[in-house]
């Protein structure tokens, strides 16, 4: 069994949870354990149903890991919530094992379930990382140079210039924008972000619109976003930490960004009533284009760039998000048009898309970047046309006449000189009669000068808003433009570094506490079962509560037998006690100062796997190991009789075989402790009652019993 930690919750490492590691090490595969909870005489469909119920039952719920702080936004995909990583309770600790000692301290590190907080987390798959960029797939698309992808400065003539490293909060030292050290803000340790805050995106499951909801599977948008985000790793791309499945809904856990470009634009237009400072605007644009260059170098079209999808952290780092419409274009299984007939929000849609192009390139993303630049200047959408709605019957994409008119009013009427391939566009013939009536001149330079208070950067701006996609600059060409590399102010890694102190940032994102979904409310407490508990929740063997595990297991045993007596009480044959054997399923075995526990004979009854021994060497310390038991030739009558035994080794030779001597707790989180036996005289064995003589089930068996009841009915 590998010591790797898996997010599914099936396996644990020996250092993080010795008890769970000892238990799960008995099974080569989690499916083996699931199969043990399926009745032997069940049909194939019933067995599969039972297996799926068990699999869903042991899956860790979202709210067992995160606390919902409030609702952020919603869309056609679902809803987005702000969440905090749950902090485990601080148990009294002494010189514990390294795994338990580090468990409380390493909550935010995310090495187990949520991934590291750094944006350079190791990704799986074949997509490129910042240091593994391929050559250009065509003459019009160039791979991002390492100096650009890593964030190193690009000076005049493309020569890398020295740039100070970005703060440790980004998890990488290769995220700096070009420019000298005077233009980059060095973040101190007290300015590091809270790495325990996340954004949870809940996808609604696809369902048919009928009276009875029928789930059809995972949406295409969710599949794209999950598959791409798991592969990408870049400082200007939002990081996906974890994907969770619960109640037929998908939860994607992203790094949290406090701002977005739409929020910044709204704040300047309503509260400040002032334009965005040039230094801030240039830094935001450079980081945005840097992220787009990384996507294009990895053969990815974003296809939905707009201010609401461009996130910005409190440290002024741009994060491109929402890859629901993104697509690999290197070797598509079908044409781009057949997959999605309508892409890009209408105000940021390129002219070739508006004219029904069946094939398009990365130039559509660069047009969107130009539209975002214009919106940052004007504090309102640059081409705000009225969208024509799609006919629900024909599902045909309508012709967007008003949107094209808004573009022509600023860029002028297109012709073959400015766009040689315009007549080959599928919808050009239907648009041509409108063009002959309206002949507009190009007023882009005047539009730019009145909002930028000068012509600085107009050449780059004009190159992004070309009718002909072949004439638009690529992302890498834009990064090397003189407006970024030669003209002051230079872009910085922290876009907010030039803002006035001490409040060198923007207001935090609005968080709504009143949410329609009661399960996702901030005051909701999820029903966390024992197999959902974190290792430090389950037991701290070297703390002041060395027998906490026995307390939990005894409580679980009592609950199981109460349900069995209510449903179908059946007396079990009592097992004769032995001098050196554990007759009860929960008792003390002779330890005599050693963490190893002697062999416990299983006299009569079904065969059982090796029991789990909890030894104590110093009164308050403890260790866990696997104890072998004698195999019995009697056939197994009940499936739950194949579970491991639990024995507890005392410190002074005391042997307790009566499980009732271990007091139970009413709550898993109770602080009640159990005082170990310290008497030098061995405690005489007492006969165990029939219900308590059965196997202690280490997995929540209440659900299994309910399942059997349903099968009988």
Curated annotation (Swiss-Prot):
Record-annotated Protein kinase domain positions: 66-484
Recorded catalytic activity of this chain's protein: L-seryl-[protein] + ATP = O-phospho-L-seryl-[protein] + ADP + H(+); L-threonyl-[protein] + ATP = O-phospho-L-threonyl-[protein] + ADP + H(+); [DNA-directed RNA polymerase] + ATP = phospho-[DNA-directed RNA polymerase] + ADP + H(+)
Compositionally biased tracts (Low complexity): 104-120, 158-175, 673-691
Location of region: Disordered: 104-188, 657-713
Main localization (coarse): nucleus
EC number from the UniProt entry: 2.7.11.22, 2.7.11.23
Cited InterPro entries: CDK, Kinase-like_dom_sf, Prot_kinase_dom, Ser/Thr_kinase_AS
Pfam families: Pkinase (PF00069)
GO molecular function (one): ATP binding
Bias-annotated ranges (Polar residues): 129-142, 657-672, 694-705
Catalytic residues of the enzyme: 304
Subcellular location: Nucleus
SUPFAM superfamilies: Protein kinase-like (PK-like) (SSF56112)
Leading EC class: transferase
Listed GO CC annotations: mediator complex; nucleus
Keywords assigned: Activator, ATP-binding, Kinase, Magnesium, Metal-binding, Nucleotide-binding, Nucleus, Repressor, Serine/threonine-protein kinase, Transcription, Transcription regulation, Transferase
Cofactors required: Mg(2+)
Entry binding sites for ATP: 72-80, 201
Quaternary state and interactors: Component of the srb8-11 complex, a regulatory module of the Mediator complex.
Database matches in PANTHER family: CELL DIVISION PROTEIN KINASE, CYCLIN-DEPENDENT KINASE 8-RELATED
Free-text function comment from the UniProt entry: Component of the srb8-11 complex. The srb8-11 complex is a regulatory module of the Mediator complex which is itself dependent transcription. The srb8-11 complex may be involved in the transcriptional repression of a subset of genes regulated by Mediator. It may inhibit the association of the Mediator complex with RNA polymerase II to form the holoenzyme complex. The srb8-11 complex phosphorylates the C-terminal domain (CTD) of the largest subunit of RNA polymerase II.
Similarity section: Belongs to the protein kinase superfamily. CMGC Ser/Thr protein kinase family. CDC2/CDKX subfamily.
Protein's name according to its UniProt entry: Serine/threonine-protein kinase SSN3
Species: Mycosarcoma maydis (Corn smut fungus)
Lineage: Eukaryota, Fungi, Dikarya, Basidiomycota, Ustilaginomycotina
């Amino acid at each position: 069994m590998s010591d790797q930690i898996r997010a599914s919750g099936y396996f644990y490492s020996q250092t993080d949870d010795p008890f769970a590691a000892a238990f799960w090490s008995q099974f080569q595969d989690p499916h083996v354990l699931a199969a043990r909870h399926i009745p032997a005489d069940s049909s194939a469909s019933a067995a599969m149903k039972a297996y799926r119920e068990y699999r869903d039952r042991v899956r860790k719920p979202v709210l067992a890991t995160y606390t919902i702080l409030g609702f952020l936004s919603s869309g056609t995909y679902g809803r987005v919530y702000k969440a905090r990583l749950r902090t485990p309770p601080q148990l009294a600790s002494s010189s514990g094992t390294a795994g338990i000692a580090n468990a409380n301290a390493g909550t935010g590190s995310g090495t187990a379930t949520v991934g590291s907080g750094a944006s350079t987390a190791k990704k799986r798959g074949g997509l490129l990382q910042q240091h593994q960029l391929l050559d250009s797939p065509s003459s019009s698309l160039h791979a991002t140079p390492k100096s650009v992808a890593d964030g190193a400065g690009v000076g005049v003539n493309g020569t890398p210039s020295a740039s100070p490293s970005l703060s440790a909060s980004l998890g990488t030292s290769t995220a700096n924008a070009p420019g000298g050290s005077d233009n980059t803000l060095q973040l101190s340790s007290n300015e590091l972000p809270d790495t325990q805050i996340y954004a949870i995106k809940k996808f609604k499951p696809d369902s048919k619109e009928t009276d009875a909801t029928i789930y059809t599977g995972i949406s295409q948008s969710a599949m794209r976003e999950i598959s791409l985000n798991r592969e990408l790793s870049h400082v200007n791309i939002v990081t996906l930490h974890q994907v969770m499945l619960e109640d037929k809904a998908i939860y994607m856990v992203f790094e949290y960004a406090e701002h977005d470009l739409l929020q910044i634009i709204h704040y300047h237009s309503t509260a400040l009533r002032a334009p965005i400072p040039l230094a801030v605007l240039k830094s935001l644009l450079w980081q945005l284009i840097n992220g787009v260059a990384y996507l294009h170098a990895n053969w990815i079209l974003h296809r939905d760039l707009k201010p609401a999808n461009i996130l910005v952290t409190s440290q002024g780092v741009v994060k491109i998000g929402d890859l629901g419409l993104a697509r690999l274009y290197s070797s598509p299984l079908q044409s781009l048009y057949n997959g999605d007939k309508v892409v890009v929000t209408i105000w940021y849609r390129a002219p070739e898309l508006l004219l029904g192009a069946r094939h398009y390139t990365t130039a559509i993303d660069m047009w969107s970047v130009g539209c975002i630049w214009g919106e940052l200047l004007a504090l309102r959408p640059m081409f705000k046309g009225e969208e024509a709605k799609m006919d629900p019957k024909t599902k045909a994409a309508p012709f967007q006449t008003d949107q094209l008119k808004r573009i022509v009013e600023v860029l002028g009427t297109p012709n073959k000189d400015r766009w040689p391939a315009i007549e080959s566009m599928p919808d050009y013939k239907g648009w041509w009669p409108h063009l002959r009536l309206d002949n507009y001149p190009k007023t882009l330079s005047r539009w730019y000068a009145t909002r930028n208070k000068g012509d600085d950067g107009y050449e780059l701006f004009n190159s992004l808003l070309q009718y002909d996609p072949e004439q638009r600059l690529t992302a890498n060409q834009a990064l090397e433009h003189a407006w970024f590399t030669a003209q002051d102010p230079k872009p910085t890694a922290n876009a907010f570094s030039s803002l006035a102190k001490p409040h060198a940032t923007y207001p935090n994102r609005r968080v709504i506490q009143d949410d329609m979904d009661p399960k996702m409310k901030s005051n909701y407490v999820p029903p966390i079962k024992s197999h959902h508990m974190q290792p430090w929740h389950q037991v701290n063997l070297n703390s002041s509560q060395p027998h906490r595990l026995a307390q939990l297991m005894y409580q679980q045993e009592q609950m199981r037998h109460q349900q069995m007596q209510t449903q179908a009480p059946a007396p079990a044959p009592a097992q004769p006690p032995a001098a050196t054997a554990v007759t009860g399923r929960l008792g003390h075995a002779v330890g005599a100062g050693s963490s190893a526990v002697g062999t416990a004979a299983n006299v009569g009854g079904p065969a059982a796997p090796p029991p789990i021994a909890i030894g104590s060497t110093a009164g308050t310390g403890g260790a866990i190991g696997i104890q072998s038991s004698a195999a019995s030739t009697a056939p197994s009558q009940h499936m739950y009789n194949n579970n491991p035994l639990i024995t507890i080794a005392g410190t002074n030779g005391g042997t307790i075989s009566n499980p009732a001597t271990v007091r139970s707790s009413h709550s898993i989180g109770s602080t009640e402790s159990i005082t170990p036996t310290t008497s030098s005289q061995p405690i005489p064995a007492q006969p165990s009652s029939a219900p308590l003589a059965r196997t202690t089930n280490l997995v929540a068996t209440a659900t299994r019993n309910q399942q059997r009841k349903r099968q009988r009915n």
